[in-house]
Each structure stands twice: as structure tokens, then as C-alpha cells.
Regions:
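ABC ATPase nucleotide-binding domains
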Residues: 1-131
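Generic alpha-helical hydrophobic packing signal
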Residues: 11, 15, 75, 110, ...
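Glycine-centered loop/turn positions within well-structured domains
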Residues: 93, 117, 126, 138, ...
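C-terminal boundary and immediately downstream tail of ABC-type ATPase nucleotide-binding domains
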Residues: 122-147
Length: 266
């Protein structure tokens, strides 16, 4: 029994050292902060040396500052111990930062699985596209047109020819011209280009290195991220409420979804 007790004590102290909570071992739970209690709970699991560590929304009850701190702590922990983590969350930031692979579910049905980059760059449907990315992807009513064997998206009086990679995928799928939902991420929109859409500013958020423009575009809400280093003059004057802003995006940044929300490249 003594050997077992010594082994348990050894594991407890190793886990405490890993989580930097050795100084709290003699404290009662009520004397610990929320973040400290979370680390103690994780330590209890580590002591058992599990092959798989399941975490079910462990940060959901923490405030924003503590949540960010604990997110970094869990990432460090993953780097220290050789254990598979299964992490359940509704927070896409946690999913993107923690996961080597992400499984996105809706109503108990798997929508898509892959690396964070794969899901961000190639969402299988509208649900995944809207879930991954902050701010979320913009969606517009548009038409997929096909002229001389080339695909383009048409909206607001302009046509944007899709990239060669997207062309090849649509050709391989035998996709026909049709009404679509066009998805474009806020960071893939630019205030320059040959063919420009126009919208009006509802809200301008100065974030320091970037400005987030919340706009009305063809009666749809849209967000554009503009890097302040690319701007000249007063941001406040240029992006006042009601001001018109012209913008464009490239064919490689277009995500085309059919009437059922499926990405036509899949």
C-alpha cells in the first residue's frame, strides 16, 4: 500500500508541476480562483494517465480574460504530455487554436472534418462557412454563370471570373449555371479593383491595426476588414455612417454554395 501511495503522490506532484499549481496543493477548493480550480480539475485527470483526455467546454463559465489565459495554458499542456485530447466546444476560436483536426456537427450530424486550415479555406457547406472565421464569412445572393467554358459569379452588375483551381473543380463536377449563395471572407475584400461593388457604412470599428466596416451591401449585412496601414487620411471621415464604399474581391476568394447550402466544389 505504501508503494501505491508513494506512486500516487509522485503523479500528483508531477501533474501539479506541469500545470504550475504546486503552491496550491495544500489549499481547499473554496480558497482557489476559477482558473486555479480549472487547472486542479485537469490535474486530477492527468494523474490517471489517460490515453484520451475528454474536455467538455471547460472554459465556458470563465470570463473573457481568464478564458484567454486558460486557452494558452491548455495549449502548453498539450505540448507537455503525450495524450490525445478530445475537446468539445461551441467556441470556434477554441476549436481553431486547440485542434489538429476539427469535427463540426449540427443536430448530431457531422458536417465536415479536417484541419483548421482546411475547414477555413474549403468549407463543405454554409453552416461550416459561417461557423469558422471571425468575423464570419459574408454571404450574398448571386448567379453562377458559364461563358465559353469559364465560370464566373455575377452580382450587383459585376462578374468575377473564378480562379483556375475552382474552374477545374466545377468542370470535374459538371456544375451548371445556377442561382447561388456567394461567400467571401471579410479579410479577402479590398478597396480597389477593376470591378467594384458598392455598399454603405453602418458601423466603423477601429481595432488598431485594422478597421472593421459593418456595411449594407445589396440589402445584406456585410463586414469588410481594412488594414489601417493601407489607408490614407482620416479613417473617421472616410468611413462615417452612411458613406458609400466601393470594394472588390478575387476569383480565388469566392465560395459558391447551391440552393441547399452545399459547396459546389465538393
Amino acid at each position: 500500500m505504501k508503494g501505491v501511495k508513494n506512486e500516487i503522490d509522485k503523479r500528483v506532484r508531477e501533474a501539479a508541476a506541469t500545470l504550475d499549481i504546486t503552491q496550491y496543493l495544500d489549499r481547499k477548493p473554496k480558497a482557489l480562483s476559477g482558473g486555479q480550480r480549472q487547472r486542479v480539475a485537469i490535474g486530477r485527470a492527468i494523474v490517471r494517465e489517460p490515453k484520451v483526455l475528454l474536455m467538455d467546454e471547460p472554459l465556458s463559465n470563465l470570463d473573457a480574460k481568464l478564458r484567454n489565459q486558460m486557452r494558452a495554458e491548455i495549449i502548453k499542456l498539450r505540448q507537455k504530455i503525450n495524450t490525445t485530447f478530445m475537446y468539445v466546444t461551441h467556441d470556434q476560436t477554441e476549436a481553431m487554436t486547440f485542434g489538429d483536426r476539427i469535427v463540426i456537427m449540427k443536430d448530431g450530424v457531422i458536417q465536415q472534418s479536417g484541419t483548421p486550415q482546411e475547414l477555413f479555406d474549403h468549407p463543405a457547406n454554409l453552416f461550416v462557412a459561417g461557423f469558422i472565421g471571425v468575423p464570419q464569412m459574408n454571404f450574398f445572393d448571386a448567379e453562377l454563370v458559364k461563358k465559353d467554358g469559364k465560370y464566373a459569379v455575377a452580382l450587383g452588375g459585376i462578374e468575377v471570373v473564378l480562379s483556375e483551381d475552382k474552374q477545374a473543380k466545377l468542370v470535374a463536377k459538371g456544375v451548371e449555371a445556377q442561382a447561388i449563395t456567394l461567400g467571401v471572407r471579410p479579410e479577402h475584400i479590398f478597396l480597389k479593383g477593376e470591378q467594384m461593388l458598392k455598399g454603405t457604412v453602418d458601423v466603423s470599428e477601429m481595432m488598431g491595426s485594422a478597421v472593421h466596416l459593418h456595411m449594407n451591401v445589396m440589402s445584406k449585412d456585410a463586414v469588410i476588414i481594412v488594414q489601417t496601414i493601407d489607408l490614407q487620411g482620416s479613417v473617421g471621415e472616410r468611413f462615417r455612417y452612411g458613406n458609400e464604399v466601393a470594394f472588390s474581391f478575387g476569383g480565388n476568394e469566392c465560395h459558391v454554395f447551391d440552393k441547399d447550402g452545399k459547396n459546389l466544389e465538393f
